[in-house]
Amino acid sequence: MLPMAILPNGDRWCHGCRQRYLRSRFPIFSVDGSRTLPTCPYKWPNGQGDVAKFLQGIENRDLWEKEHGQIYRIWSGMKSEVVLTQPSHLQAVFRDSNKHSKAENNNSGYLMSELLGQCVGLVSRERWRTLRAVTEIPFQHDKMPSYLELIQRHTRHHFDRLLASGDLRQERIHPAQDLKMLPFWVVAEIFYGECDAEMKTELQQLCVLREDLFKRMIQGGIVRWQWSKYLPTATNRALAEFQRRWRAFNQRAYDRACQQQRILPIVLMIEAAREGSTSVEQIYQTIDEALFANLDVTTGGISWNLVFFAAHSDIQERVRQEVLSATDHDAYLLSSSTLLAACISESARLKPLAAFTVPQSAPTDRIIGGYNIPAGTNLVVDTYALNIRNGFWGADSQCYRPDRFLEHRATELRYQYWRFGFGPRQCMGRYVADLVIRTLLAHLVAHYELGWVEPDPGKNSTWQRDLESWITIPDLQLRCVQRRND
């Protein structure tokens, strides 16, 4: 007798069974019980995650919202995720975000668990509070003045190298590729102190290994399942090599700091783990999150600013004059009320780092958009709907106008704008990220003039992005001419 899956219409039968099973396992009804929540069809094996949600999220979010409305459901693997698109949805959900739980392994499965499943960004409740207390100290707001010299030094040296051996010699710059490693080395020095040549070589090699593993994780499939760890695959071999070398690197960095009698974050974190407040693996994965996982994140945050400056020479010149007229340069870089800071916020508004946020769940039932969402249901935010399609931003919401951020107080933007998250679980590295971006852009506009290689840049929605990256980053070159007074 032939298996059902290879009988005529067998695939359709299996598909229908999966749909019915998932809807019965994760039932969501309207408040009056007359309707079920609109839901994207489950597609074996990944559902709408992670390729459809991240790599293709910008295009898919439009299609899904048009088909299903302002609140609907997608599947990440076989996990239910409810998509929120309106500020009113966020008000109902995030009022107690400190009590929320992040989705286990980001709903991405086994390989993600081995890379980041225990990092501070993905654990919840008491585990999160304990780990955050151990790891957040070097990233607190009051530490930023002490990093100014470090960040400015790395910025100068990075541009010197680009001028000596990069395309900058030909007055060209690729914002993502050419600036990718600058924030990486800044964060590495915060954790480990100034890295010697051997440490830099090992970190660069680990970057390549880690990037390949993350790309494989995004593709999903077999690496979602726990049993895949027993298979003799290239992915498992690469994972074992990365974990072995990453643990060894951090142990050597710890030993080096102890020998030098330096109280660096790597020392404080590992000693906290050895005292039992957290685990060494949680520390390693949290450093991984800050260095490797956030490599693309910070690259995206930096690089779109250059593209917008190239397309808007008037704004670029205004920022340049602001930079040159600052009487206290350090205070200027630390300020959040400058045109420079507004430009960074506006770039992040128009080019959110990802189309959907990391899934998390509320501890109690919520009524959202006329539906009763049970406690523990994973929720994600459509960042384009919030940052661009939101009526709060006015008729010019799709236009680049940084001054809009000088017209609103920060409290007015709550639930209207997504960048680093919401509430106490906002990104731990947000202050360092902002300081790196401000320093880089201030250096750039003071010493270089950005322009478009092509005569007509077109609309920002048509600018080429890297289609292989889970983060929205540009894939294009700009004209970058050193100013004559330099």
Curated annotation (Swiss-Prot):
Keywords linked to the UniProt accession: Heme, Iron, Metal-binding, Monooxygenase, Oxidoreductase
A single MF term (Gene Ontology): iron ion binding
Species assigned in the record: Aspergillus oryzae (strain ATCC 42149 / RIB 40)
Record's function text: Cytochrome P450 monooxygenase; part of the gene cluster that mediates the biosynthesis of aspirochlorine (or antibiotic A30641), an unusual halogenated spiro compound with distinctive antifungal properties due to selective inhibition of protein biosynthesis, and which is also active against bacteria, viruses, and murine tumor cells. The non-ribosomal peptide synthetase (NRPS) aclP is responsible the formation of the diketopiperazine (DKP) core from the condensation of 2 phenylalanine residues.
Required cofactor(s): heme
Residues annotated as transmembrane: none
Positions that bind heme: 427
Family classification: Belongs to the cytochrome P450 family.
Classification via Pfam families: p450
EC number: 1.-.-.-
Pathway field: Mycotoxin biosynthesis
InterPro entries per the UniProt record, alphabetical: Cyt_P450, Cyt_P450_CS, Cyt_P450_E_grp-I, Cyt_P450_sf, Cytochrome_P450_Monoox
Protein name listed in UniProt: Cytochrome P450 monooxygenase aclC
